[in-house]
């Protein structure tokens, strides 16, 4: 109805001119800032942008056909110098390497599906034609299926008879060792022989006076 009453196709508003010419756009305070949420620079597409790295708009090249996977996680630091697209576009998402290699058998989720309750219980009558997802769980291997560890396969090493004899003699000498006789005990408090320090009746400074 509005086209019949008054057509505005031939009218160009000041707002449209300001947007096309990017009027009022202030340069960045310093280069290298994150411009992920900014619009695309129209002058850069025409190779006419003279602001360079100070331009507040994104400089996107035409060959960027794949979305940057690091930008999706907020980890890309290249900015406009990145060779991938910094724009959320489902048609240009990077292809999963595992999906390209294994196809539908890829274990990574590509479509949102509901897990089959019957399959989780233990049996699904629909089988492979079930419309719900049948996840594949990696079960741990049993002890009989696991390969033997390297230290278990090595034969036990035999010690030399000389070493065994030395160890036995050391153990026997350590086991037969008893308390020292009092004649060989010297008290560190008084310096006399014949008793231990805990049995000494003199003071701990008696060795200084020679008493």
UniProtKB/Swiss-Prot annotation:
Question: Tell me, which GO biological process terms does this entry list?
Answer: mRNA processing
Pfam families from the entry?
A: zf-CCCH, zf-CCHC
- Which Gene Ontology terms cover its molecular function? RNA binding; zinc ion binding
Location, primary (coarse class)? nucleus
Q: Disulphide bridges in this chain?
A: none
Task: Name the UniProt key words of this record, in alphabetical order.
Answer: Metal-binding, mRNA processing, Nucleus, Phosphoprotein, Repeat, RNA-binding, Zinc, Zinc-finger
User: Where is the protein situated, by its record's location annotation?
Assistant: Nucleus
Which residue positions does the secretion signal occupy?
Answer: none
- Residue spans, zinc finger C3H1-type: 35-61, 62-89, 111-137
Q: Which family does it belong to?
A: Belongs to the CPSF4/YTH1 family.
Cross-referenced PANTHER family: CLEAVAGE AND POLYADENYLATION SPECIFICITY FACTOR SUBUNIT 4, CLEAVAGE AND POLYADENYLATION SPECIFICITY FACTOR SUBUNIT 4-RELATED
Q: What does the annotation say about its assembly with partners?
A: Component of the cleavage and polyadenylation specificity factor (CPSF) complex, composed of CPSF1, CPSF2, CPSF3, CPSF4 and FIP1L1. Interacts with FIP1L1.
Protein's recorded name: Cleavage and polyadenylation specificity factor subunit 4
What organism is recorded for this protein?
Mus musculus (Mouse)
Taxonomy of origin reads:
Eukaryota, Metazoa, Chordata, Craniata, Vertebrata
